[in-house]
A protein has these predicted regions:
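A conserved helix-loop-strand patch within extracytoplasmic ligand-binding domains
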Residues: 102-158, 242, 260-264
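An extracytoplasmic/periplasmic, membrane-proximal ligand-sensing/linker region
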Residues: 35, 166-171, 175-182, 250, ...
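Bacterial signal peptide processing site
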Residues: 20-22
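Short helices/loops that flank or line small-molecule/ion binding pockets
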Residues: 46, 65-76, 92-94, 174-179, ...
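Beta->alpha turn/N-cap motifs
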Residues: 63-64, 74-87, 104, 135, ...
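Ligand-binding "clamshell"
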Residues: 90-100, 108-121, 203, 215-229
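Bilobed "Venus flytrap"/periplasmic-binding protein-like clamshell domains
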Residues: 25-61, 126-196, 279-282
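C-terminal motif of bacterial Sec signal peptides marking the signal peptidase cleavage site
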Residues: 15-18
Length: 297
């Protein structure tokens, strides 16, 4: 049995305060964007296939500032978070340059257990982090950020990013160029919704993209690797209330069966199916689980 409740933003908080979880259901939620509509479906459908647990979905609940208190209060039991987000945005801790995935995971696991009575399970296998993307027409032949620095020194390279990227502290534009000494001829502040079109149309030459964004593949963009480890790790992993693990003793082992099963390419392709082809997240999730042999058709 599954129930689906669509909640967005502040309205979601109001509704959450008015109604509590079903006592017998595991409540899975996500943030209000494509990847976070797909991932709850992957987790939920797999749980339903492998256990007798009833699953309730609360879709598109909000960003991390809403998800964290909802998890802490028990309004939701489970969602997928990214280790770097948990470390920087929730725990307000810094990641060391080049810090390993295991180290970041251990920090967030310890912090969430102490502060929120929730824990992080094994990562799903992909990281959704920043990459510097450019069109292949530019012929920079850059595979790493350091390669892009060298290409920028030839002149004429225009960088475009959302306004928020220029304002971010710790892992925004100013800190980026302190680590990587780019020589941009111009920087532009762009609406995130038009950033890829600006790149495709040649209005800018380089943008900070997310590694699992389906438009990378569909627009045939070239991506680069953060070779100096400037950005923290953003490994995707299930975050679950510890009392839910007690209530459903089989849950932890079942969720950990998904560890390492979703590659960056898998996630990118699934996002593209929803964002570009218009497929439903639940159908994309089902197809993925079937194709990987994780559930029956």
């Amino acid at each position: 049995m599954k129930k689906i409740i669509g909640l967005v933003g502040i309205a979601g908080v109001i509704l959450l305060s008015a109604c509590s979880n079903s006592d017998e259901a595991l409540v899975i939620s996500g943030k209000p964007w494509t990847e976070q509509f797909i991932l709850p479906q992957i987790l939920g459908q797999y749980i339903e296939e492998k256990t007798d647990i009833d699953v309730e979905y609360k879709e598109g609940l909000g960003e991390v500032a809403i998800m964290t208190p909802a998890l802490e209060k028990g309004d939701i039991d489970l969602y997928v978070e990214y280790t770097g987000t948990g470390l920087k945005d929730v725990l307000k801790e810094e990641s060391e340059v080049g810090e390993s995935s295991d180290s970041v995971l251990e920090k967030v696991r310890k912090g969430y257990e102490e502060k929120f009575e929730a824990t992080w399970l094994s990562p799903l296998g992909f990281e959704n982090t920043y990459t510097l993307a450019y069109t292949k027409d530019n012929e920079y032949n850059a595979e790493t950020y350091s390669d892009m620095v060298e290409a920028s020194k030839t002149g004429g390279m225009v960088f475009g990013a959302p306004h928020a990227f220029y304002e971010r502290k710790g892992d925004g534009f100013d800190d980026l160029i302190n680590t990587y000494p780019f020589v941009f001829s111009e920087t532009q502040s762009l609406d995130p919704n038009v950033m890829y079109e600006a790149l495709k149309n040649g209005d800018v030459d380089v943008i900070p993209a997310f590694t699992t964004d389906g438009r990378i593949e569909r627009f045939d963009l070239q991506t680069t690797t953060d070779d100096l480890g400037f950005f923290p790790k953003y490994d995707a992993a299930p975050v679950v209330r510890m009392d839910a693990l007690e209530k459903f003793p089989e849950l932890e082992d079942v969720l950990n069966e998904l560890a390492g099963k979703i590659s960056e390419e898998d996630m990118l392709k699934m996002n593209a199916r929803v964002d570009i082809d218009g497929d439903k997240p639940e159908d994309v999730a089902h197809d993925f689980l079937v194709e990987k042999g994780l559930i029956e058709k």
